[in-house]
């Protein structure tokens, strides 16, 4: 699990001080999904700039220069590629018809296959996410068509963001969560991977006092927001993407269980939160979604209360 976060200011009426406070608040709140590395990207004097470090966000002072009109951020929980080598961390630089920065929340499992099949150049970057950047660079464009091609080529769980040198922001929504808000009065878009990140950050930075609209972003959507705040969209075909799990109930009937990529990642990473696979499977079987379980992992009290309630109900039903 990682987190994406950021904002785009298209009116220029929010003070630089408040926007810097918002950036840090978003980054700190996004630690709930990753503390191995943190980074942001922004445009300075017409050039894309990336600042990232192998540290949790609260130990980094994010200070985009005055006049910055968009910030794209990421907090990382390492799955592939050692975070101690900073080139493995997000955001990444990309070069097509425009220079851009790129970030990913999720896990891609066909990155090595794509590098061979598409004859992508060798790179020291070990992170699975970087293959998406290479696919865009190979096409030589950053637009709806190239993003669609990339999204339909990769396999795994994902939500991608990109920010180009013109302060145009792109969002590609796969199976991983994303929340996008529009503050029309302020001329400001703010986004983060989860609602809980946004709630914490808006409260901390004081933006909860202003009216906003929740923009629903569905799986298979590609959004573009330009520097004037104009939003346009396209779509891509969602690919079936799962792996097979364990065989069980051999004494009754051989049955094959499979999970979505987001559920698989929960099963892989749950031990980092002191939770067993059995606990996660119990919640999934009970009907909780992967997004709901992710929220619980970040709130240990809620998780323990829910597990206790589910177990008590199961024991009652078995009596």
Across the structure, where does each feature detected by a protein language model lie?
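Conserved short alpha-helical segments that host acidic/polar catalytic motifs at enzyme active sites
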Residues: 1-319
């Amino acid at each position: 699990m990682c987190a994406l976060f950021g904002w785009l200011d298209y009116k220029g009426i929010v003070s630089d001080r408040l926007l810097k406070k918002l950036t840090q608040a978003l980054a700190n709140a996004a630690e709930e999904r990753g503390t191995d590395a943190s980074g942001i990207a922004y445009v300075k004097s017409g050039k894309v700039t990336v600042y990232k470090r192998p540290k949790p966000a609260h130990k980094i002072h994010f200070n985009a220069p005055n006049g910055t009109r968009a910030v794209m951020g990421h907090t990382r929980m390492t799955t592939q590629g050692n975070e101690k080598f900073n080139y493995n961390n997000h955001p990444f630089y990309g070069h097509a018809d425009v220079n851009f920065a790129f970030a990913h929340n999720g896990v891609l499992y066909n990155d090595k296959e794509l590098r061979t099949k598409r004859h992508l150049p060798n790179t020291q970057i070990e992170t699975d996410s970087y293959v998406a950047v290479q696919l865009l660079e190979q096409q030589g464009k950053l637009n709806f068509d190239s993003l669609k091609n990339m999204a339909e080529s990769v396999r795994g769980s994902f939500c991608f963001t990109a920010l180009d040198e013109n302060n145009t922001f792109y969002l590609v929504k796969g199976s991983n969560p994303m929340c996008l808000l529009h503050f029309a009065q302020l001329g400001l878009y703010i986004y983060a991977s989860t609602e809980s990140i946004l709630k914490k950050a808006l409260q901390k930075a004081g933006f909860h006092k202003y009216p906003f609209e929740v923009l629903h972003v569905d799986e298979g959507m590609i959004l573009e927001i330009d520097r004037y705040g104009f939003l346009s969209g396209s779509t891509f075909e969602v690919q079936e993407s799962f792996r097979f799990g364990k065989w069980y109930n051999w004494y009754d009937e051989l049955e094959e269980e499979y999970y979505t990529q987001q559920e698989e990642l929960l099963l892989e990473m749950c031990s980092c939160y002191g939770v067993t696979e059995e606990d996660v499977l119990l919640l999934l079987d009970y009907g909780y979604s992967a997004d709901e379980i992710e929220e619980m992992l970040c709130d240990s009290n809620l998780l323990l209360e829910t597990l206790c309630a589910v177990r008590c109900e199961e024991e009652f039903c078995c009596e």
